[in-house]
Amino acid sequence: MPVKQSRFGALKKVSGRLKQIWLGRDEQSQPRPMPRLLVVDDEESICFSMSEYFSLQGFRVDTASELEEAEKLLGVTNYKVVIQDLRLTMTTNQDGLDMIKLIRQQNPQTRIVVLTAYGTAEIEDEARRCGADAFLRKPKPLSQVAQVVQGLIESPPRQAARPA
């Protein structure tokens, strides 16, 4: 007697095939390497929506909701882009600024997009001094975040900071 496939299993199979078509792949073509993306935000709904959106755009996405979790991931994975909030705790931007510095020390080629609701000109200047490539204020449509990410990926590699 044949095994009956669940509706969820059938949907998952169709969803996987649609994703292949969307990304321009079929069984005969070689898959393109998927750029790695890390989303760091204490709001899990933002991590989830960005993960889903960028996965459909052809990225391999990891998420972290705390600084310590992000540090662990950054220690074992080379990300093309990190999209991060500045306030990973409820009180200060320092966690996010420290993370930018950490990324710059560990992998200067990683592109950093800051996405925060606490964006003043002073905070943006500080984030850029720490090494952020782009600074966006929440709320921002995912399509606009994706345009910024794609622009950074297509731009020339970051030059390492030169000692004074």
Indicate where each model-derived feature is located:
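Two-component/phosphorelay signaling modules centered on CheY-like receiver
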Residues: 44-62
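Alpha4 helix (beta4-alpha4-beta5 surface) of REC/receiver domains from two-component response regulators
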Residues: 94-98, 118-136
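Two-component signal transduction core modules
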Residues: 82, 112, 135-136
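Non-catalytic signal-transmission and effector/linker regions of two-component phosphorelay proteins
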Residues: 1-36, 105, 143-164
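The short loop immediately C-terminal to the conserved phospho-acceptor aspartate in CheY-like receiver
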Residues: 43, 87-91
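Short amphipathic alpha-helix used as the core "switch/output" element in two-component signaling
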Residues: 72, 93-109, 129
